[in-house]
Amino acid sequence: MFDSTKKSLHSMSDSANRFQNKITSKLPGEHGEDAMYDIRSVHGTGPRLSIKYVDVTKLPPPPKHASQLRAGGSSTGSTPRTASPAVGNQDYSKPSYSQPSYSQPSQPPKEPALPSRGTPSLPSRPGSRPSVLNQEQVPPPPVRPNVMSQMPPPPSYSSSGSYSQTYQSNANYTASSPLPTASANAPLPVPPPRRVSQNSSYASGSVPAATAASTASPVKKPPPPAPPKPRRLAARTSSNSSGVSSPTSVPPPVQRNTRPNL
């Protein structure tokens, strides 16, 4: 099994090499060795990155690792490598950046972005906030007068005069606009006559059963009959009184798509 697979892989690689040689032979001479016409990475026979003629000694130093950038930007302790390894032996564990750093030490910031709370900030720049030493020269804010003292006192609703006035105003409103009440002499609305069957006699006090039933509740329709069960299902599920199903005669299925016997 393994030998046959190996032979098939060898034959595939040989055919791919022959196909590549046939294509490169048809290309012009100045473009035959160009990286743009290298199709080994497309067909998977060569390296994934078909980069040719790379001088490793002329490459810039690799970018610094994040652990080396924390030491205040000083690159004295770490010795940068002058040449990067080959393409095949490149170490992918460290992060690679698009723009390599050319070993320029990062300059520390000249002044902090936000001053600390303990040290007073010096008023060197124009438009800055006054320092703690110059706070005595700032005039205090003007004192606002008491607004509540200028307002009149609120009306007292607990006195008897105001309560009687409001009660009288409510009484006047009620007397001026009385509510519409039903007068005693107005005739009462006549109820609609009840539906009575023609052959009923109320004089004798006997009420027919149909009228009583119609006044009590509407007549309900009887439920529809249950659909009959199919014959085969009923024959299979039929059982004796003892619970054991008895073998009953099941009719043969009807063959519908058959030709009639001529």
Swiss-Prot record:
GO cellular component term, pick one: cell division site
Predominant place of localization: cytoplasm
UniProt feature, compositional bias: Low complexity: 92-105, 114-131, 157-169, 203-219, 235-248
Ranges where the record places region Disordered: 1-262
Location in the cell: Cytoplasm
UniProt keyword terms in alphabetical order: Cytoplasm
Lineage top rank: taxon: Eukaryota
Positions with biased composition (Polar residues): 10-24, 170-184
Protein's name according to its UniProt entry: Uncharacterized protein P8B7.26
Organism in which the protein naturally occurs: Schizosaccharomyces pombe (strain 972 / ATCC 24843) (Fission yeast)
